[in-house]
Design a protein with these regions (language model features):
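Left-handed beta-helix
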Residues: 211-213, 218-355
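Arg/Gly-rich low-complexity intrinsically disordered repeat tracts
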Residues: 155-165
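Residue-level signal for inorganic ion chemistry
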Residues: 32, 88, 107, 150, ...
Length: 355
């Protein structure tokens, strides 16, 4: 899923080239390239599909030439994650009704790729022959207020007292739990209570379910969305598909998959995992994933000199020389003709400043 605009990462991320297409970490690969790469031993490249805005088609083809052009699906407008998932699921289902699907954002990072691949492999085994939805829950390491949370069911593994089992124990994934509830982004005190209580996981927005289950669930829970694709589906794999998509996709409800399905379905399970995940949603989160110098400065750029600076994050990927003196706890970011200098604690205002 690669249609977002990454507005919190301005000026590095812009509507013309959002963060999923940028070498955020300064390692020579964009986030979408890293995303496709970490699936490459689990899912063959011929089974990779990209859903993005039609304005990003050329960027996707340039950065991922190995993905067949026919598997780059173009949204004529933004309609959130539920229409995105319905679009690609219905198209795959039309030709491959037994398909097992993984949905992943294109702009996240994973530090422990080997563990990630093992989790995905186990997840696909779990969902292959079950009518369930599996979501990955990240083990929380701090009381984070920037993520939604997943509450795992706390029932015991026993039926001696007539209690229904809430855990599906399998040889491949014995720690998979039924989901009790999805929680919105909490305040700090609530986030602390989640950590103290246990059984709460960060919602990574990574979902695994088979194509039949996607089609059935959305038809039951979001019939107005399903009806749009009932109209579109006969034109899949025909020359008229782009025209029909442009005509009907804008009529889809603007709704997230979390609100449309995950919070309502009774068949959602969570797989707790720990593979160094971050959604890189803010400059602050990027700072924690970059190497830091002896003064806790993190920088991405070819020619940066920091003098008497502390706790700063600097992202200036151009070749121009950058000299910064005397700043503490600042964000310095440059892109094309725009330069941002702001205090870290004020970064939530960045979305407003770019308007």
């Amino acid at each position: 899923m690669a249609g977002g605009v990454g507005s919190r990462f301005w000026p590095m991320s812009t509507p013309e080239k959002p963060k999923q297409f940028i070498d955020v970490l300064g390692i020579g690969k964009s986030l979408i390239q890293l995303t496709v790469e970490r699936f490459n031993t689990v899912i063959p490249i011929e089974n990779v599909w990209i859903v993005t805005s039609e304005r990003y088609k050329n960027i996707v083809m340039e950065q991922l030439p190995e993905v067949p052009e026919s598997q780059i699906l173009l949204e004529p407008c933004m309609r959130n994650t539920a229409p995105c998932i319905e679009y690609v699921s219905r198209k795959i289902y039309a030709k491959y009704p037994e398909a097992n699907l993984v949905f992943s954002p294109a702009d996240h990072i994973v530090l422990d790729v080997n563990t990630f691949r093992e989790v995905i492999k186990n997840s696909l085994e779990f969902t292959e022959n079950r009518d369930v939805i599996l979501t990955l829950g990240m083990m929380p390491t701090r009381p984070e207020t920037g993520y939604g949370y997943i509450k795992a069911c706390g029932c015991q593994q026993t039926t001696d007292n007539g209690q229904q089992l809430c855990r599906d124990v399998t040889p491949v994934a014995s720690n998979i739990h039924k989901v009790e509830a999805f929680k919105e982004k909490p305040n700090l005190e609530t986030a602390k209570s989640y950590l103290n209580e246990g059984g709460y996981y960060w919602n990574a927005g990574i979902f695994i379910w088979n194509a039949k289950m996607v089609v059935k669930t959305i038809a039951n829970l979001v019939p107005d969305l399903a009806s749009v694709f009932d109209t579109i589906a006969p034109y899949f794999y025909t020359d008229k598909e782009p025209e029909i998509i442009n005509q009907y996709f804008p009529t889809c409800p603007n709704i997230s998959i979390d609100y449309a399905v995950m919070e309502k379905s009774k068949e959602v399970f969570v797989y707790p995992a720990d593979f160094g995940w971050s959604d890189l949603g803010t400059w602050g989160s990027l700072y924690t994933h970059l190497d830091q110098d002896e003064n806790n400065n993190a920088s991405v750029g070819q020619n940066i000199k920091l003098i008497d600076c502390k706790n700063c994050v600097v992202h200036t990927p151009s070749e121009r020389k950058v000299v910064i003196q005397g700043l503490d706890n600042y964000i310095i970011a440059e892109s094309d003709n725009t330069l941002l200098i702001c205090r870290k604690e004020d970064e939530q205002q960045i979305k407003d400043w770019q308007k």
